[in-house]
Amino acid sequence: MATLSMTLSNPKSLSAPPRRLSPINTSAFTSTSFRLRTKSSFDSISFSSSTPFSASSLLLHTSYTKRNHRCFSVQSNAEVVTEPQSKITHKVYFDISVGNPVGKLAGRIVIGLYGDDVPQTVENFRALCTGEKGFGYKGSTFHRVIRDFMIQGGDFEKGNGTGGKSVYGRTFKDENFKLSHVGPGVLSMANAGPNTNGSQFFICTIKTSWLDGRHVVFGQVIEGMEVVKLIEEQETDRGDRPRKKVVIADCGQLPMSEA
């Protein structure tokens, strides 16, 4: 069984030696290598493996500088929502529960999707929300959370970032990069490199412009950003997995007249 070695070092304390994490099973992986590099307020993480991994694992090169972002609503002290970049054509929702083994309902996240700009990507996400193809997001978890960065979910097969599939097959190509990671609430596809989109996605909690041209943006949180922040604030283990299960207890599509 092949293993993946992960080294984590803290740029805030350069004198501290890197911390070694336990090996991660990569027997299901099907690509070659991936790297997540973070700069600024959070840790630098690098991954390497001679064993391929699935196209569902998130590849991000991150360097965070705080900038101002435009807002169109402030629904609570915890909720600041970035202005939509384009016309919203569909609305979907996640009802989120947090806790072990069965969580307490934490609230609803409503997401607007940009179907005119990225119709294939939007249709994939919409159908996974409704479950109309016989599989989808209901009952899956947010398996990876990095504060001041993003929350990641969508692996309804394995729940660890190595599974998931699109409604078109295992993966599909990057549709385009018309839209940008302009601020909190932006919804974007996780991938393992170019043209490896499946079902995994992430919701930004900051502006992440360094991801432009690498990940396909296709939606925006329009209600429930306080629930996104609640997920972001969950305690995580050294692999960025929330210690309490964060589950999409229910999900689906909303009429355009509803928010």
From Swiss-Prot:
InterPro entries: Cyclophilin-like_dom_sf (IPR029000), Cyclophilin-type_PPIase_CS (IPR020892), Cyclophilin-type_PPIase_dom (IPR002130). GO terms for molecular function: peptidyl-prolyl cis-trans isomerase activity; protein histidine kinase binding. Its EC number is 5.2.1.8. Residues 96-253 form the PPIase cyclophilin-type domain. One of its GO terms (biological process) is NAD(P)H dehydrogenase complex assembly. Residues 1-13 have a biased composition (Polar residues). It catalyses: [protein]-peptidylproline (omega=180) = [protein]-peptidylproline (omega=0). Residues 1-21 are annotated as: Disordered. It comes from the Eukaryota. Gene3D superfamilies: Cyclophilin-like (2.40.100.10). It is found in: Plastid, Chloroplast thylakoid membrane. Induction: Down-regulated by pathogen. Up-regulated by light. Disulfide bonds join C204-C251. One of its GO terms (cellular component) is chloroplast. It is a peripheral membrane protein. Ubiquitous. Keywords: Chaperone, Chloroplast, Disulfide bond, Isomerase, Membrane, Plastid, Rotamase, Thylakoid, Transit peptide, Transport. Part of the chloroplast NDH complex, composed of a mixture of chloroplast and nucleus encoded subunits. Component of the NDH lumenal subcomplex, at least composed of PnsL1, PnsL2, PnsL3, PnsL4 and PnsL5. Interacts with AHK2 and BZR1. Belongs to the cyclophilin-type PPIase family. NDH shuttles electrons from NAD(P)H:plastoquinone, via FMN and iron-sulfur (Fe-S) centers, to quinones in the photosynthetic chain and possibly in a chloroplast respiratory chain. The immediate electron acceptor for the enzyme in this species is believed to be plastoquinone. Couples the redox reaction to proton translocation, and thus conserves the redox energy in a proton gradient. PPIases accelerate the folding of proteins. It catalyzes the cis-trans isomerization of proline imidic peptide bonds in oligopeptides. Responsible, with FKBP13, for all PPIase activity observed in thylakoid lumen. This is Photosynthetic NDH subunit of lumenal location 5, chloroplastic.
